């Protein structure tokens, strides 16, 4: 006798179940390291069978990935205009501030490279748009690939600053950190623009006086 096909779970029910597992995970991450959390205890906390977890996620790391994509990365994507990157970053930092124990647990359990992969593409896109927009206005980039080099520099620097802030090595508010990053980025790009202007003036300056 042929086996009955497994009926797909309704979307709303599936999303509700994933949200329940996410909240259970956040509760546990505030108490202990990720490697001490089991799928069984997450399922038990949600009143689910262990198999229900595997219907939605491959493992706990897959649940962590979904959690950050749903709750944190989406904040950046809501503010992806070139003029709104500061607001997107501020919303992300406020999320981290509200979930600092969870983010610290993820950072310490998984490492910077694993966590940054969730945000790298979005932060890269935000900074790259800012650099491109300034270049369109004043043409300060002097060589092919210079914009990407500058973008990568700021992405790596920003990741390090945010990591230190998550670990509370930096004592400042989310607003103060965004203001600092904004000012640093603005000053550095303004310096590049000023150098480009000086170079243009030097190249266009007449060499010597007119012969008599």
Which residues are covered by each model-predicted region?
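Alpha-helical bundle regulatory/interaction domains
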Residues: 1-32, 36-212
